[in-house]
Amino acid sequence: AYIVGSIPTSYLVGRIASGVDIRERGTGNIGSSNLTAQVGAKWAAPVVIFDIGVKGLLPVVIASDRVLGLGIGVEAAAGIAGVIGHNWSIFSKFHGGRGMATMLGATLGLNLPLLIIYGSVPAIGVLFTPWKDSAVWFLIAVILMPIWAALLNLPIELVWFSVAFALVTAAKRMTSNSLRDNAGVI
C-alpha cells in the first residue's frame, strides 16, 4: 500500500501533460491542488480519481473480506499506509501531497458513514460559510473523524484509523511548513 501510495501522480502528469515540474512552481507541493493551479483542472481530475481509487480504495479492498480477508485492522493499516506513501513518497525524496484524496478512497473502502462525515464537512464549509479554503475544512473534518467514529460506535480499529489519520495530517502540515525554503519549493 505504501509503494502504491508513493506513485507521484501529480508530478508525473504535470511533466507529461505540459512539461511542468510542479515541485518548482506554485506551492512546490506535488499534490493535486498544486497541479490544478499550475497545469489546470482537466489534468488534475484524473489524478484525483487515481489517488482516490488506486492509492486509497484499492489497498483497503485487497485487504478486505472481498479479497484477502485480513480483517478491519489490516484494512485500516493499508489505508493509512497509502496515505503515508502519498504524503512521503519513496519516489520523490519523501515529499508528497497532503493525502486528502487518498484518504477519501481509504475511507470509502472502510466505512461509508465515516466517509460521509469526512466529505460533508468540507463541502458544507465551502458552500455555506464565508471561509472558502477547503484545506481548513478538511483539517476540521480530520479532527472530527475520531470523535465521530467513537460516537457512531464504530469498531475500535476505525477509531484508531481516524486518530492515525489525524496524526499523519498534523505531521504533514508541520513538516511541509518547516521544509519550505524562501523560493517556495519543498
Region roles according to the model:
Residues L12-A44, G96, S178-I186:
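Cytosolic, membrane-interface loops and tails of multi-pass inner-membrane proteins
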Residues V20-G31, F91-L104, W131-A141:
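Short, non-helical or kinked segments that cap or interrupt transmembrane helices
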Residues T36-G40, A63, M100-P130, I143-L152:
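Interfacial segments of multi-pass membrane proteins
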Residues A37-S64:
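Multi-pass membrane catalytic core of lipid/isoprenoid biosynthesis enzymes
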Residues L115-S120, D133-A141, N153-A166:
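Loop-to-transmembrane alpha-helix initiation sites
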